[in-house]
Amino acid sequence: MPYIGSLKVNQFRNLADVDITPHSQFNFFFGQNGAGKTSILESIYYLSVGRSFRTHLPQRLIQDNTDRFLIFITLYNGTQFIPLGVERDCQGDRCLRINGETASSWSLAAKRLPLCSLSAMSHRFLLDGPRVRRQFLDWLMFHVEPSFFSIWQRLQRSLKQRNASLKAKLPLGEITHWDKMLVEDGERLHQLRQNIVTEFKPLFTQMLQQFLPAYPLIGHYFRGWSEKYSLMEQLQINLKQDLQRGYTQAGPQRADFRLTLRDLPAQDILSQGQQKLVTYALHFAQGLLLKEKTGISPIYLIDDLPAELDANKRDCVIDLVNCLESQVFISGIDPNEIRLPPHSTLFHVKHGKVAAL
């Protein structure tokens, strides 16, 4: 399994100078609100995907009165440790380096550093629009299906061109010129998503049974256009409305994966704590499927685990994570709220300083 052997963070949020050696399995960061616990997890997340899970404004990540931040790790890849780091300045320039070389794409970091992130807002999986749920499925395909990323990139280009043509109200021939490419890649992407959902659902049911046995949720995959028509037929049917609205209404960019309980949306029935457990079940199943398909376990980032969960549920989460055999970074206020296994390291975070205990 991949794991982070060392972590250095400079001038990222309130973390002025952090240099720690995480445990290869459990790591628990505790401290008061605002101490910097979540920022530790956020820095790892940023290094993997090039963005924050807390803000869309990257300039807020740079510590006050400084002009740049640096995040650096050594990552064990199964055979050796490789260096991976990023520097970003207040002008927006950033440099990602992997194994001593400048990386041309952030997908290279994401591939080497697979993360399952469970933040305080993860329950939004059920509440937010379809985009977050598509991203959940696409994360899996990015890591397990070699052809996915190129298909996804081509689809985005075709969709962007078609939408621009619709918005500009170009002649019909120039609009429909993009349909063939959009349909080819759209149908392939749909098939990949459908296959991954079929493999994912039994694992999700298995995980959910551990947390909420009385709530047999059912997952429903919607491909993004009517089951009555092919994608090409749907584009032709929708063309007049697409022209009026200036964008493509049907296609895999509209896909969704919804959860229901007794034919009702899960979010209408479950409490916030229960929604949090559903999200945990989703991400643990995601990690299990990745391991089944590739032999690689993701690193888990679990922010504020104790919140909204009683002691029994907290213990259940820890026991399940322990079975996943992955490196885990967990945050919370009180270390006594978590029953950590022997193979773990406890870190105290105070005013942006981090110390192993």
From Swiss-Prot:
Protein source organism: Coxiella burnetii (strain CbuK_Q154) (Coxiella burnetii (strain Q154))
Protein's name in the database: DNA replication and repair protein RecF
Record keyword Cytoplasm present: yes
Keyword rRNA processing in record: no
Pfam family for this entry, one: SMC_N
Gene responsible for this protein: recF
Similarity section: Belongs to the RecF family.
Lineage, highest ranks first: Bacteria, Pseudomonadati, Pseudomonadota, Gammaproteobacteria, Legionellales
Function of the molecule: The RecF protein is involved in DNA metabolism; it is required for DNA replication and normal SOS inducibility. RecF binds preferentially to single-stranded, linear DNA. It also seems to bind ATP.
Keywords per UniProt: ATP-binding, Cytoplasm, DNA damage, DNA repair, DNA replication, DNA-binding, Nucleotide-binding, SOS response
PANTHER family (UniProt xref): DNA REPLICATION AND REPAIR PROTEIN RECF
